[in-house]
Amino acid sequence: MACGLALLLLAACGASAPPDDAAIVADFRNHQSNVEVTADGAVVRLLPDRTSSTGTHEQFIIKLTSGDITLEVEHNISIAPRVPVALGDHVIVHGEYEWNAEGGLIHFTHHDPKGRHEGGYIQDNGKTYD
């Protein structure tokens, strides 16, 4: 409970949650979804944008710094600015993890204009995009 309160206070003050790749690896192994995570990794593949009913999503793949797991990142550029990621960039990604057999994906990497979901972000080259 105290950790949850500390994270809530950090989020309320605009501070970022520390990366926890070990938690993501555990979420992957346990087929967990709908979990707020902060990942630390390198961009290994750029994907074309995808448009859905919720907007246009910038997509790329990262490999976690502390393991062999890769994650797809889906960043809604209808809500937040595009992140100018390039292959090899080191990024910190905070959002909601969804399990899949390829490693999983992280979405909600932006603020929620309706205020119903915890805000996420992507840090790239010293700048935060949310």
What spans do the regions from the language model cover?
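Bacterial N-terminal signal peptides
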Residues: A2-A11
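OB-fold and OB-like single-stranded nucleic-acid-recognition modules
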Residues: C13-D130
